[in-house]
Structure formats: C-alpha cells, structure tokens
Amino acid sequence: MREITYAEAIREAMSEEMRRDENVYLLGEDVGIYGGAFGVSVGMIDEFGEERVRDTPISEAVIAGAAAGSAVTGMRPIAELMFMDFSTIAMDAIVNQAAKMRYMFGGKAQVPFVLRCPAGSGTGAAAQHSQSLEAWFCH
C-alpha cells in the first residue's frame, strides 16, 4: 500500500477534482506561487494556471465571501484560510451567508464550496495560529 502525507493526499484530491471539473478552483493566501503555508498546493499553479489557483490578499473575510459568492454562480471553489484561528474573521460569510443562502432563497440557491483551514498545526506558531476549532463546524 502506498504511503503519503496528509498534504500529499489533499493535493491529489484537489488536483483530481480540478481535472474532473473545470469549475473547481483554489483560492487563498499564498496558495499559488508559494504553494500554500504548508506546501499543500505546491505545483498546482503550474498545472492549472493563475485563473484556477488564485493568490488572495490577507483577508479571510474576502476569501470566504468570494468563495460563497462564486459558488452561487456555479463555480466550485476550494477556499483555504492559512490557519483555522482566522476562520473567526470569516464567520459572517461562512455562517450568515454561505450556510443560510439556500434557505434564504427557498432552495433555489446552492453554495457548493470547500473551506480548508489547517488547525492545531503543532508548529509552535503561537496563540493565534494553533487553535483547533473544528467543533464549531460540526453542528
């Protein structure tokens, strides 16, 4: 059986979906040329180009909001926040917009997007880069 890291498995899964569906794209801080904070998207910009692997400004609210907005138009974004701690900054877009939009529009709107947030990284990255807030998204 082949052994790979979580980062490699995530990269393979994202690439597989991007090959399968041209509406899937990746956006987030440093996901393009740099390959993401933990190297998960290394090389993806070479295969899929800047239109589908998009570096964003350091604004978690914009990343989540752009993902939700583009998902409603038929795109299938994979939005990466550099650390789960910063999902708190994006909660309006996640909780009040993306999570409720289908119901606010009587089932006519769909918001298919993936939000990736590395959590509890174990890198000694201090108090604002080490929380594990997964339970917030499980209910």
Predicted regions and their residues:
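Thiamine diphosphate
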Residues: 1-139
